[in-house]
From Swiss-Prot:
The lineage of its organism: Eukaryota, Metazoa, Spiralia, Lophotrochozoa, Mollusca. This is Arginine kinase Oct f 2. Muscle (at protein level). Substrate binds at residues 56-60, 217, 263, 305. GO terms for molecular function: arginine kinase activity; ATP binding; creatine kinase activity. It is an enzyme of class 2 (transferase). It comes from Amphioctopus fangsiao (Ocellated octopus). Residues 111-347 form the Phosphagen kinase C-terminal domain. Coiled coil: none annotated. The keyword Lipid biosynthesis does not apply. Stable below pH 9.0. Degrades by incubation at pH 9.5 and 10.0 for 1 hour. The keyword Cytoplasm does not apply.
Length: 348
């Protein structure tokens, strides 16, 4: 299987993925027969990237142990993607939540439509989608939901499994853009949708400012969000949820990598802090992308990666996930968004 996949990759002349760049014949021969303690193989890691030659990264981790067993290729991809000289990540640090110096980025309410911060988390005792069986997913859902149901205060809420979700709830959550689906072909090829929709679901707080996706791409995606630009409130809520969940669950992490995720692009802080912001003038300027790059920001359409902007509204987020702390990541995003607002205001 691995041999066939590697041959397909080598023959894909239009493929420019990081997998193709870094999985040399020498590395392939060295790694192809190895197995992780979860039973993961090199074939499990590279299947999606070989079947989808237009992949950007092209490699997933079959499980937390893959980052050790297949380090020779994964480390090379990680350094290239995260633009770092060596695989290194600091100890997690969310800052002093009582003294963050992060507030409302848009007090006027004229530009920022909404603010969202999310992290991914993986159970350390379960593999990632390529090695998971149906029973694993069900068990993981059970322990995740048990922890979620212990949340209190503004984080208290309800869990809705996808497997027996009513049409009304499904319609409402889709309209709210809260629901995830099984339409990503890269994830599909990586076994991300095996046994769909069993073992998957969504938890949200009563006022829907805190959500958790269970067994979407990662085991857990913790999401804090609200209308307007108060990044401080959104971030503080997320940190509170993370701290409470960490008391109940053991998450996969590695000293030099931070928190482990299915895709190596999300490693480290796993944090994506974003705003939906109206920038009709700045977005038309030829230097828009270079301004984003200067402040380590990523701009994309409001419906996710590879989508277009609607009415000059863009999703602006931090680009760097690895090699910096959570607090550094969110403050870097804050400084960048402040500059974006300044540039938009000064554009004619």
């Amino acid at each position: 299987m691995a041999e066939e996949l590697f041959k397909t990759l080598q023959n894909a002349k239009e493929c420019h993925s990081l997998l193709k760049k870094h999985l040399t014949k020498e590395r392939f021969d060295k790694l192809k027969g190895l197995k992780t303690k979860f039973g993961g193989t090199l074939a499990d890691c590279i299947r999606s990237g070989c079947k989808n030659p237009d992949s950007g990264v092209g490699i997933y981790a079959s499980d937390p142990d893959a980052y050790t067993v297949f380090a020779e290729v994964l480390d090379a991809v990680i350094m290239d993607y995260h633009k770092i000289d060596k695989v290194h990540h600091p100890i997690p640090d969310f800052g002093d939540v009582n003294n963050l110096n992060i507030g409302d980025l848009d007090p006027s309410g004229n530009m920022i439509v909404s603010t969202r911060v999310r992290v991914g988390r993986s159970h350390d005792s379960f593999g990632f989608p390529p090695v998971l069986k149906k029973d694993d997913r069900i068990k993981m859902e059970q322990v995740s939901v048990e922890a979620l149901k212990s949340l209190d205060g503004e984080l208290a809420g309800s869990y809705f499994p996808l497997a027996n979700m009513s049409a009304d709830v499904q319609k409402q959550l889709t309209e709210d853009h809260f629901l995830f689906n099984d339409s990503d072909r890269f994830l599909k090829a990586a076994s991300g949708y095996d046994d769909w929709p069993i073992g998957r679901g969504i938890y949200f707080s009563e006022n829907k400012t805190f959500l958790c996706w269970v067994n979407e791409e990662d085991h857990l995606r913790l999401i804090s969000m609200q209308k307007g630009g108060n990044l401080g409130e959104v971030y503080k809520r997320l940190v509170s949820a993370i701290n409470k969940m960490e008391k109940k669950l053991n998450f996969a992490k590695k000293d030099n990598m931070g928190y482990l995720t299915f895709c190596p692009s999300n490693l480290g802080t796993t944090m994506r802090a974003s705003v939906h912001i109206k920038i009709p003038k700045l977005s038309q300027r030829s230097d828009f992308k270079s301004i984003c790059d200067k402040y380590n920001l990523q701009a994309r359409g409001i419906h996710g990666e590879h989508t277009e902007s609607v009415c000059g509204v863009y999703d602006i987020s931090n680009k760097r996930r690895m090699g910096l702390t959570e607090y550094e990541a969110v403050t870097e995003m804050m400084r960048g968004v402040n500059e974006i607002i300044r540039e938009e205001t000064n554009s004619t």
